[in-house]
Curated annotation (Swiss-Prot):
Catalytic activity: a quinone + NADH + 5 H(+)(in) = a quinol + NAD(+) + 4 H(+)(out)
Subcellular location(s) of the protein: Cell inner membrane
Gene name, Swiss-Prot/TrEMBL: nuoH
This enzyme's EC code(s): 7.1.1.-
Protein name: NADH-quinone oxidoreductase subunit H
Subunit details: NDH-1 is composed of 14 different subunits. Subunits NuoA, H, J, K, L, M, N constitute the membrane sector of the complex.
Keyword Translocase among UniProt keywords: yes
Similarity section: Belongs to the complex I subunit 1 family.
Primary location group: membrane
UniProtKB keywords: Cell inner membrane, Cell membrane, Membrane, NAD, Quinone, Translocase, Transmembrane, Transmembrane helix, Ubiquinone
PROSITE patterns for the chain: COMPLEX1_ND1_1, COMPLEX1_ND1_2
GO biological process entries: aerobic respiration
């Protein structure tokens, strides 16, 4: 068996198996994310939420997915059908392939490349095309306005996210996620992680992630009171399901990025406890809980407030932080908190 996996076909089988394992993890997580999102929202509103299908309503997401799949796919008469059908697939596939460089433990990653951050940033930047394609191909004013809003919103907050990540790269000396986690490994456990020296950026990254993934209170591209459902107005059945799945997968990806960049990835918060993927998944679940709580509690922003926050507050502050981190890392200020080089030095 070992000889087989050293051959060309064996390596191909191994790669396919690894891809399917990551795909399976993300898809199973998706079921629990939707269920958890609905349960948290219901609890805040003093409702019960899903509670009929399966134990504690756990199979409600499966039932809803089956309902979408068996429904008829309705394409508007004036729509550009090829682009209309391609848009949700683009959104879903791009959200999935970003997971190729996300490690869950030391060595547990599909592609352990040195430019992993650039890869994720490039793929996430392309996700806006799925939304624009869906809005334009629908041949309707509400989807088109929603897609324009989404494009402006995602581009605005990608700039801030990029600058925040640059601060972490300057501290680490690497764009590899495993190296970034290794740089946070210290004798003080939880207090050795990057959340402490980069504390202001943790809050900025979290808020920018909400805007980047079109989550409340920044869900302006699909604001029901203004645009009915934004770029999703004309979609039904499986295409709508793909859009929603892509959105939740992108949210979970942001939870993974926060965990890897600032909260030690798979490292244990207590030094004498073993590290492992359970810590990684647990931290991601915690940040998704925060995403869901913000959705349930915070009212929606106006569009002008959203743009003003991104360009006049987040952008200058994150740019100033990059300069500060570069200066602190170069001269090893604050006890070398900003100069824990994983490579080079």
């Amino acid at each position: 068996m070992a000889d087989f996996f050293s051959t060309g076909p064996g390596i191909a089988v191994l790669i396919i198996a690894q891809c399917l394992a990551v795909l399976g993890f993300v898809m199973v997580s998706l079921l629990f994310l939707v269920y958890g999102d609905r349960k948290i929202w219901a609890a805040v509103q003093m409702r019960r939420g899903p509670n009929v299908v399966g134990a504690f309503g756990l199979l409600q997401t499966v039932a809803d997915a089956l309902k979408y799949v068996v429904k008829e796919v309705v394409v508007p008469a004036g729509a550009d059908k090829p682009v209309f059908m391609l848009a949700p697939m683009t959104s879903f596939v791009l959200a999935m392939i970003a997971w190729a460089v996300i490690p869950f433990n030391d060595g547990w990653v599909l592609a352990d490349i040195n430019v992993a951050i650039l890869y994720v940033f490039a793929v996430s930047s392309l996700e806006v095309y799925g939304v624009i394609m869906g809005g334009w191909a629908s041949n309707s004013k509400y989807p088109f306005l929603g897609s324009l809003r989404s494009a402006a919103q995602m581009i605005s907050y990608e700039v801030s996210i990029g600058l925040i990540i640059i601060g972490v790269i300057l501290s680490t000396g690497s764009m590899n996620f495993s190296a970034i986690v290794a740089a946070q490994d210290g004798d003080f456990g939880f207090f050795s992680w990057y959340w402490l020296p980069h504390l202001p950026m943790v809050f900025l990254f979290f808020i920018s992630a909400l805007a980047e993934t079109n989550r409340p209170p920044f869900d302006l591209p699909e604001a029901e009171s203004e645009l009915v459902a934004g770029y999703q107005v004309e979609y039904s059945s499986t295409p709508f399901l793909l859009f929603m799945a892509g959105e939740y997968i992108a949210i979970f990806l942001m939870c993974a990025l926060i965990t890897l960049l600032f909260f030690g990835g798979w490292l244990s918060p207590i030094p004498f406890l073993p590290d492992g993927p359970i810590w990684m998944v647990g931290k991601m679940a915690f940040f998704f809980f925060l995403f869901a709580m913000v959705k349930a509690i915070v009212p929606r922003y106006r569009y002008d407030q959203l743009m003003r926050l991104g360009w006049k507050v987040f952008l200058p502050f994150s740019l100033a932080w990059v300069v500060f981190v570069a200066f602190a890392a170069q001269f090893e200020l604050f006890g070398g908190a900003y100069a824990r080089w994983a490579i080079g030095g």
